[in-house]
Amino acid sequence: MKTVKVNIVTPDGPVYDADIEMVSVRAESGDLGILPGHIPTVAPLKIGAVRLKKDGQTEMVAVSGGFVEVRPDHVTILAQAAETAEGIDKERAEAARQRAQERLNSQSDDTDIRRAELALQRALNRLDVAGK
């Protein structure tokens, strides 16, 4: 089966590099399914899971925003942060979820609601990818 080269890169360095049959990402405009030979595209990403399918198996990588650049034979994901399922510390992710939820529930005047919502989304995404 045909494959496409996928690189996931953060400011801290590469996170993932493999030949994949299909990539699914959550873009600002909606979900994108990318197969080999896809038309060139650049799209901003939402917080979400990147699904990478190969040989009947699906791997997941949690990404926190960024961009996807698609070429017919190569997909590059430039993410603000990214972690493979194996690399996620579940206890740390759960603690981050609890902190974000507490900030949202506090309703104090100095709470930055948008930042707390984004922190909660990131924590929930990490927990989802890690499989709780």
Curated annotation (Swiss-Prot):
Q: Name one GO cellular component term.
A: proton-transporting ATP synthase complex
- Principal location listed in the UniProt entry: membrane
User: Where in this chain does the entry annotate a coiled-coil region?
Assistant: none
Q: Does the keyword Cell membrane apply?
A: yes
Q: Where is the composition biased (Basic and acidic residues)?
A: 88-102
- A GO molecular-function descriptor: proton-transporting ATP synthase activity, rotational mechanism
Membrane-related topology note: Peripheral membrane protein
Region of interest (Disordered), ranges: 88-112
UniProt subcellular location = Cell membrane
Matching Pfam families:
ATP-synt_DE (PF00401), ATP-synt_DE_N (PF02823)
Listed A to Z, the keywords are: ATP synthesis, Cell membrane, CF(1), Hydrogen ion transport, Ion transport, Membrane, Transport
Keyword hit for Membrane:
yes
Please provide the Gene Ontology terms (biological process) for this protein. Answer: proton motive force-driven ATP synthesis
Family assignment from sequence similarity: Belongs to the ATPase epsilon chain family.
Cited NCBIfam families: ATP_synt_epsi, PRK00571.1-3, PRK13446.1
What function is annotated for this protein? Produces ATP from ADP in the presence of a proton gradient across the membrane.
Q: What does the subunit comment say?
A: F-type ATPases have 2 components, CF(1) - the catalytic core - and CF(0) - the membrane proton channel. CF(1) has five subunits: alpha(3), beta(3), gamma(1), delta(1), epsilon(1). CF(0) has three main subunits: a, b and c. The F(1)F(0) complex interacts with SpoIIIJ and YqjG; YqgA is found in the same complex.
Q: Per its record, how is this protein called by name?
A: ATP synthase epsilon chain
Q: Per the UniProt entry, what species is this protein from, by scientific name?
A: Bacillus subtilis (strain 168)
